[in-house]
UniProtKB/Swiss-Prot annotation:
<keyword id="KW-0479">Metal-binding</keyword>
<dbReference type="GO" id="GO:0000166">
    <property type="term" value="F:nucleotide binding"/>
</dbReference>
<keyword id="KW-0560">Oxidoreductase</keyword>
<feature type="active site" description="Proton acceptor">
    <location>
        <position position="262"/>
    </location>
</feature>
<dbReference type="GO" id="GO:0019145">
    <property type="term" value="F:aminobutyraldehyde dehydrogenase (NAD+) activity"/>
</dbReference>
<dbReference type="Pfam" id="PF00171">
    <property type="entry name" value="Aldedh"/>
</dbReference>
<dbReference type="GO" id="GO:0008802">
    <property type="term" value="F:betaine-aldehyde dehydrogenase (NAD+) activity"/>
</dbReference>
<keyword id="KW-0547">Nucleotide-binding</keyword>
<feature type="binding site">
    <location>
        <position position="101"/>
    </location>
    <ligand>
        <name>Na(+)</name>
    </ligand>
</feature>
<dbReference type="GO" id="GO:0047107">
    <property type="term" value="F:gamma-guanidinobutyraldehyde dehydrogenase (NAD+) activity"/>
</dbReference>
<feature type="active site" description="Nucleophile">
    <location>
        <position position="296"/>
    </location>
</feature>
<dbReference type="GO" id="GO:0047105">
    <property type="term" value="F:4-trimethylammoniobutyraldehyde dehydrogenase activity"/>
</dbReference>
<comment type="function">
    <text>Dehydrogenase that catalyzes the oxidation of several aminoaldehydes. Metabolizes and detoxifies aldehyde products of polyamine degradation to non-toxic amino acids. Catalyzes the oxidation of 4-aminobutanal and 3-aminopropanal to 4-aminobutanoate and beta-alanine, respectively. Catalyzes the oxidation of 4-(trimethylamino)butanal and 4-guanidinobutanal to 4-trimethylammoniobutanoate and 4-guanidinobutanoate, respectively. Catalyzes the oxidation of betaine aldehyde to glycine betaine.</text>
</comment>
<comment type="function">
    <text>Dehydrogenase that catalyzes the oxidation of several aminoaldehydes. Catalyzes the oxidation of betaine aldehyde to glycine betaine. Catalyzes the oxidation of 4-(trimethylamino)butanal to 4-trimethylammoniobutanoate.</text>
</comment>
<dbReference type="GO" id="GO:0042803">
    <property type="term" value="F:protein homodimerization activity"/>
</dbReference>
<dbReference type="GO" id="GO:0019285">
    <property type="term" value="P:glycine betaine biosynthetic process from choline"/>
</dbReference>
<feature type="site" description="Transition state stabilizer">
    <location>
        <position position="164"/>
    </location>
</feature>
Amino acid sequence: MASPAMVPLRQLFVDGEWRPPAQGRRLPVVNPTTEAHIGEIPAGTAEDVDAAVAAARAALKRNRGRDWARAPGAVRAKYLRAIAAKVIERKPELAKLEALDCGKPYDEAAWDMDDVAGCFEYFADQAEALDKRQNSPVSLPMETFKCHLRREPIGVVGLITPWNYPLLMATWKIAPALAAGCTAVLKPSELASVTCLELADICKEVGLPSGVLNIVTGLGPDAGAPLSAHPDVDKVAFTGSFETGKKIMASAAPMVKPVTLELGGKSPIVVFDDVDIDKAVEWTLFGCFWTNGQICSATSRLLIHTKIAKKFNERMVAWAKNIKVSDPLEEGCRLGPVVSEGQYEKIKKFISNAKSQGATILTGGVRPAHLEKGFFIEPTIITDITTSMEIWREEVFGPVLCVKEFSTEDEAIELANDTQYGLAGAVISGDRERCQRLSEEIDAGCIWVNCSQPCFCQAPWGGNKRSGFGRELGEGGIDNYLSVKQVTEYISDEPWGWYQSPSKL
């Protein structure tokens, strides 16, 4: 029997060097496809976070900031572009590691690596553009003053990222933070840290100055919590669950520390009766089953017009049964395992609860018959939903789509907004004006028209309501990591003249 593919053995990345964790502990890496242990990651703790934050602070202040924080954006851009080039050079290796680590189909993981490189390139451009934005003048009503603005890095930032897009979600935070001149400590999810540690290797290879990016892997309570509460961290950016987001806000509050939160979702996709059914079916399934259904923005609540519901559901079942569920490294895989046994059991519980509450499982909901091991769940479509059901209200984070019918546009809007979340939404219709109306009516940070899930680093990303606040990516993405300073100068030769001058002796 062939031995399992193993992941590289790495340490923590602190101050430009590999360091063993202070307490010497390590966590197993489990391949969700085979359930086999394929390596280990270091289990960092508060001592390691302290060292990483100290390294980041030293890098920020080195040479009074001239080496990084106050260096021209063009200097930082060179490093970001070098990282992007190395990611592309190592794309096959990185994509395979991500497939092994979190179960993502290889083709998706390879696409993610292109996006990782593209994001570093984009924020390299933004770093250079920042040079041109410096000292921008402000028009004032008094000619005796002139004013300009400086945009300065906010400082040391703590970045806490999830396991569904391990390297890409980390890049969404690292690239703009470094472009802005910040230094950073990254704490990736303990369920998928492998490619983030390989990013550290890339940073070392391209000569990124020591301490600019530090990576501490480990459990949330042991490493993430000390990072978010650290008094020498100036900002925290987090992507993950609503419950963890609340804890991060609470830990930041005593220091009035800014946070950016991208949390959960239960996003709607609204399909009207004027669509090409097969095109709409494919986008509907892609919107929910992409990345094995583990997407914050998954459009996992399908609202389908009553007139076409029966035919649409039949075609969805046919398409879903045609999705290749397999080892992520198999050619043509379109659905791999969910990331861990814990997630697997949680998703199965959601499905069984829905069934016990009266919902109908149209297809899926079980392990594929041909896969004896691994955390696999067939693409699942559930109907006969009521709006009080758990499956309608709670984020499943797996390949589970729930379906509800509507008759009027107003009803569709009401159902679409019947959620505590507001990350994304989609509408599919041949009526452009109707699509425009719904894009305005749905309460979410991102709306897709006649598609679902496309995401580009050139456009802002973030949610409303319990999906968090702040926007990443886009031209404003770098501003998350900048502090604006106004510099106002009195330019008149005349004295100010507010106080009466004392008599000269």
